[in-house]
A protein has these predicted regions:
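Extracytoplasmic and endomembrane cell-envelope/extracellular-matrix remodeling and assembly machinery
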Residues: 1-102, 178, 194-195, 199, ...
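Canonical positions in the second alpha-helix
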Residues: 34, 70, 103-104, 137-138, ...
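Structural marker of alpha-solenoid helical repeat scaffolds
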Residues: 73, 107, 141, 158, ...
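Alpha-helical adaptor scaffolds
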Residues: 78, 82-159, 163
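Extracytoplasmic/secreted proteins, especially bacterial periplasmic and envelope-associated proteins
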Residues: 62, 96, 130, 181-184, ...
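TPR/TPR-like (Sel1-like) alpha-helical repeat modules
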Residues: 140, 167-195, 208
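Alpha-helical solenoid repeat scaffolds, predominantly canonical TPR units
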Residues: 30, 66, 100, 134, ...
Length: 220
């Protein structure tokens, strides 16, 4: 019986194969062969997989040629937007990624693929305040999203806001249940807080929360 193809599922499979299942050189060979078979039902996924394989092999221009063709037919596809962001950043043109993503993020600001790619593009473009603002809004809704905290930490570090950087690192450790490491990071943050007494008060309160969490964990 003929079953309609699930495009998103096929793209997800291609992504896993291209990025994780094969070594970089063989991934290129595999997807070049898949594209050459010209099976229409899966050709788009094979092209996408080939683009990702080219990226792993540092053949960025070849990857971009394919992704330009794919995204022209499906501009809102999250798989394609994610890949194009990586390509623009690899080419040293993160602002092109920012502009590409902007209307999609405006329409759907809570989508993690869009928000985190936009934040990454901002950081790559040295627009740290924009990245932090976007990530703060995202974390209001998805406060336990690890990658968002990691990107926040990177933005703070590159903008030399070291107290905030250590606070973001603390949140990452806490998500893993490593509360003692989280407390260490907050103590570093406290030392960088200077004369900001309100900030120090917030840090002390968070230290207490993490120590309480560690005590509860030890009692289990």
């Amino acid at each position: 019986r003929y079953l309609p193809i699930n495009k998103q599922f096929e793209l997800a499979k291609a992504r896993i194969k291209a990025r994780y299942s094969f070594k970089a050189d063989y991934a290129v060979e595999y997807f070049e062969a898949a594209v050459a078979q010209d099976v229409q039902r899966s050709k788009e996924a094979s092209l996408y997989g080939l683009a990702l394989a080219y990226m792993r092999a540092e053949k960025i221009e070849k990857a971009k040629d394919i992704m330009d063709e794919l995204i022209a037919k499906d501009r809102g596809n999250l798989f394609y937007l994610d890949a194009m962001t990586d390509i623009y950043i690899s080419q040293g043109e993160p602002l092109k990624a920012v502009e590409m993503l902007r209307p999609h993020v405006t329409h759907n600001p809570r989508n993690q693929v869009l928000a985190l790619n936009q934040a990454n593009a901002y950081i790559s473009a040295n627009k740290y305040e924009e990245a932090v603002s976007l990530l703060k809004d995202f974390l209001l809704v998805k406060k336990d999203y690890q990658l968002a905290h990691q990107l926040m930490s990177e933005a703070y570090q590159k903008s030399k806001r070291f107290s905030q950087m250590h606070q973001s690192k603390a949140e990452v450790y806490a998500l893993y249940g490593a509360y003692n490491r989280a407390v260490d990071e907050l103590q570093y943050a406290y030392n960088f807080a200077g004369d900001d007494h309100l900030e120090k008060q917030r840090i002390r309160a968070r230290i207490k929360q993490f120590r309480d969490q560690e005590e509860r964990l030890q009692r289990l």
